[in-house]
Design a protein with these regions (language model features):
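Non-catalytic interface/linker regions that flank or bridge core catalytic/transmembrane domains
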Residues: 1-42, 54, 222, 231-237, ...
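Acidic/His-rich, divalent-metal-binding segments that scaffold phosphate/diphosphate chemistry
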Residues: 1-95, 105-109
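Histidine/acidic-rich helix-loop-helix segments that form or flank divalent-metal centers
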Residues: 59-63, 105-146, 165, 177-224
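Conserved beta-strand-loop-short alpha-helix elements that form
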Residues: 147-160
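Active-site-proximal, acidic helix/loop segment immediately C-terminal to a metal-coordinating Asp/Glu
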Residues: 159-173
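SH3/SH3-like beta-barrel fold
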Residues: 206, 227-232
Length: 280
């Protein structure tokens, strides 16, 4: 991100440095940008009539800076370990971050689509909802890029680690977004996101119908409920040294019964465990 911003402007470097004052916020922006880059390129990347970004670097920078307005908020708010009440002073300040971000990017001379992503990524289809802000914003003002990053923003907010809440398992977050498609989020773009990520995104820990536990390692092209998986714990509850590969699209006698929180099972070693799977 620093390298990309350095080729853009000194102002971009400055706001990124400001975001780094909160590890939680900075990590959120990094994760959102990483997901946005993959999903947007799959949907629009090959069509120059629909892809507004001049190159991949601009795409990453724009998606990273969607929350740039939080750079104006004090660390005591960004890293607070408690959830704020809706009528609290802190919550009112948080709700201003899209306007702060739009103003900052406009002053920096950033393209209009980047300003749009910062300003409207919290606007819902039903603007009467408390979770929709800025209050006077209309959903029609949100670009397709903004509508996509709104979905990715809430997905990462749910699955990411937060000091004031327990993170959601990725499958639960995907179900949440699916239920709100056409209510809070753009239905068509939500559908694209579902098909790109799958009901069980890569790396999701799941329990199979026989009681074994496995990591999802693919997004199926047809039945989103039946990804390829690698079993890490058998039906007897024993951890395996050599892990079994299964394609649930082929193994019809098995299915996924539920998603699991990998932090509950593996703690901070979850990613390392997943990256070092040994398939027999």
């Amino acid at each position: 991100i620093d390298t990309i911003a350095d080729t853009s402007s000194a102002e971009a470097m400055g706001v990124i440095a400001a975001l780094k004052k909160s590890d939680q916020t900075y990590a959120h922006c990094i994760d959102v940008a990483a997901i946005f880059q993959v999903v947007y390129k799959k949907i629009y990347g090959g069509n120059r009539d629909h892809n507004v970004f001049k190159d991949e670097k601009q795409m990453i920078l724009a998606s990273f800076l969607h929350d740039v307005g939080k750079a104006k908020l004090p660390s005591s708010i960004l890293d607070c370990t408690e959830k704020f009440e809706n009528d609290s002073r802190e919550k009112l300040l948080i709700r201003k971050h899209p306007l702060y971000g739009a103003e900052m990017l406009s002053k920096m001379g950033m393209p209009g689509f980047m300003v749009n992503m910062a300003k409207y990524h919290h606007v819902k289809l039903d603007t009467s909802m408390y979770s929709s802000y800025p209050e006077d914003a209309r959903y029609e003002s949100a670009s397709k890029e903004t509508r996509l990053i709104a979905i990715i923003d809430i997905y990462q907010a749910l699955v990411g680690r937060r000091s004031y809440k327990k993170s959601w398992a990725p499958p639960a977050a995907m179900r949440y977004i699916e239920q709100l498609a056409g209510i809070e989020y753009d239905f068509e773009i939500s559908e694209y996101f579902q098909h790109m990520m799958g009901h069980f995104p890569k790396g999701s820990l799941v329990e199979l119908s026989d009681g074994s536990q496995a990591f999802a390692i693919s997004v199926p092209k047809t039945d989103l409920e039946r990804p390829q998986v690698i079993i890490v714990r058998n039906a007897k509850g024993q951890y395996l040294e050599n892990h079994t590969f299964l394609d649930l699209a082929v193994e019809k006698d098995l299915s996924i019964s539920k998603g699991l929180d990998h932090y509950d099972i593996f703690g901070e070693a979850s990613l390392e465990f997943f990256m070092n799977l040994q398939v027999s």
